[in-house]
Regions:
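Trp/Phe/Arg-rich N-terminal binding region typifying the photolyase-homology
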Residues: 1-164, 168
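Glycine/tryptophan-enriched, flexible segments
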Residues: 145, 150-229
Length: 229
């Protein structure tokens, strides 16, 4: 069994790690709700609610592929490795797949997760997905960093000319698993375990505010592709 760990890659199309997981066997997916970590990063309530709404859409898409989406809660990313290990042990996971994220806390989170899983003979596959090139991989002939942007740009363009990144399709539907997907909370307060609310004394006004944000920022891959067209 393979496990895909969704983070900021809440999509099924052109998802490198999800594609890798599905190509190696039956796959389940997991998402970690970490309210205290989000607050440390000063993520706004409207941003967290966007994630919540996108997860609902994603869960429906995954259901069409027979990939159950599990929701787990922990306060911060320091708790993520243990939480993921428990999921892996519960479902006899052979390898966890995720797409690389490059923030300071993100890199420490992933390193700790890799270390813990490897101690239990569970693989950790971190894929290049959000960038065209792995950070630090564009170097001079003397293996140094470029000091002139024009030269750096030419090397990047040459590499893209030689081989453009492949656009990956959504995974094909797999055989149905005897694993139930977790429900996703229908409001921000419950989703964040009380960590986020609109802080509005007038709840009617608060509901109008969140509805307005949802209208201006619709979720779903179809809307995103339409805006990019």
């Amino acid at each position: 069994m393979q496990l895909h760990w969704f983070r900021s890659d809440l999509r099924i199309h052109d998802n490198t790690a999800l594609h890798a997981a599905a190509s190696q066997g039956a796959v389940i997916a997991v998402y970690l709700v970490t309210p205290q970590q989000w607050q440390q990063h000063e993520d706004a309530a409207c941003k967290v609610d966007f994630w919540r709404r996108q997860l609902i859409d994603l869960s429906q898409q995954l259901a069409g592929l027979n990939i159950p989406l599990l929701i787990r809660h922990c306060d911060t990313w320091q708790d993520a490795p243990q939480q993921l290990l428990e999921v892996c042990q519960q479902y006899d996971i052979q390898q966890l797949h995720c797409n690389a994220e490059y923030g300071f806390n993100e890199r420490h989170r992933d390193a700790a997760t890799r270390q813990l899983l490897q101690q239990h003979a569970i693989g950790f596959n971190r894929c290049l997905d959000q960038l065209l090139f792995k950070p630090g991989s564009i170097r001079t002939q003397s293996d140094g960093y470029f000091k002139v942007f024009g030269q750096f740009k030419r090397i990047c363009q040459q590499r893209l000319y030689d081989q453009l990144p492949q656009v990956l399709p959504a995974p094909k539907p797999q055989a149905k698993l005897a694993i139930q997907a977790d429900a996703i909370a229908q409001n921000l307060h419950d989703f964040s375990l009380g960590g986020y609310c609109l802080n509005d004394a007038d709840q009617t006004s608060a509901a109008t505010k969140i509805d307005s944000i949802a209208t201006q920022w619709p979720v779903g891959e179809a809307h995103a592709m339409q805006r990019l067209a």
